[in-house]
Amino acid sequence: MRKRQPVLKQEKTLNPELKTWLYASGSLTQQLTELGGGKFSVKPFKEHFQRLTFADSQWMNMPHTHTSWVRETYLYGSDVEPWVKAKSIFPIQSLQKKARIFQHIGSKPIGLFLFQRTTPLCDRRVIRLPEGWTRQSCYTWHGCKFIVQETFLPAFEAFLYQQHDKELL
């Protein structure tokens, strides 16, 4: 007789507390800073140029032959481990306009500029990637389109569970 492997529900089902974060509007930077008790940092780990993927080009209504500038970072709250892996995709056309500022922000969060005195248009989708639950947002900001992908990592989910357990005590 074959032994059944246990099914890990948390891998396939969405925790209600995490769902709130995946569908929250506004600045994730501000929300993570508040959750972390004022602690928040950005650690860029990769910046490069690449051709738009077919899916991304369709979502932004641009030719897939266009080049984009990609910035990948880890977002930290009050933990030593990163909470979020962020990937921002800026088509070259957007970098020739106001969005060029994002190429030069270093370890500053995109949200600091994106939500400053404006509320950009945002289309959002939520997907499950191997690294974790992910929200992908296609922003239109001052006429510039770009994608910000935020994957909530296991350390963030663990922090949410700890916070939830504290509230129950």
Curated annotation (Swiss-Prot):
<comment type="function">
    <text>Removes the pyruvyl group from chorismate, with concomitant aromatization of the ring, to provide 4-hydroxybenzoate (4HB) for the ubiquinone pathway.</text>
</comment>
<dbReference type="GO" id="GO:0008813">
    <property type="term" value="F:chorismate lyase activity"/>
</dbReference>
<dbReference type="InterPro" id="IPR007440">
    <property type="entry name" value="Chorismate--pyruvate_lyase"/>
</dbReference>
<keyword id="KW-0456">Lyase</keyword>
<feature type="binding site">
    <location>
        <position position="71"/>
    </location>
    <ligand>
        <name>substrate</name>
    </ligand>
</feature>
<dbReference type="Pfam" id="PF04345">
    <property type="entry name" value="Chor_lyase"/>
</dbReference>
<keyword id="KW-0670">Pyruvate</keyword>
<dbReference type="GO" id="GO:0005829">
    <property type="term" value="C:cytosol"/>
</dbReference>
<comment type="pathway">
    <text>Cofactor biosynthesis; ubiquinone biosynthesis.</text>
</comment>
<keyword id="KW-0963">Cytoplasm</keyword>
<dbReference type="GO" id="GO:0006744">
    <property type="term" value="P:ubiquinone biosynthetic process"/>
</dbReference>
<feature type="binding site">
    <location>
        <position position="150"/>
    </location>
    <ligand>
        <name>substrate</name>
    </ligand>
</feature>
<feature type="binding site">
    <location>
        <position position="110"/>
    </location>
    <ligand>
        <name>substrate</name>
    </ligand>
</feature>
<keyword id="KW-0831">Ubiquinone biosynthesis</keyword>
<comment type="similarity">
    <text>Belongs to the UbiC family.</text>
</comment>
<dbReference type="GO" id="GO:0042866">
    <property type="term" value="P:pyruvate biosynthetic process"/>
</dbReference>
<protein>
    <recommendedName>
        <fullName>Probable chorismate pyruvate-lyase</fullName>
        <ecNumber>4.1.3.40</ecNumber>
    </recommendedName>
</protein>
<dbReference type="InterPro" id="IPR028978">
    <property type="entry name" value="Chorismate_lyase_/UTRA_dom_sf"/>
</dbReference>
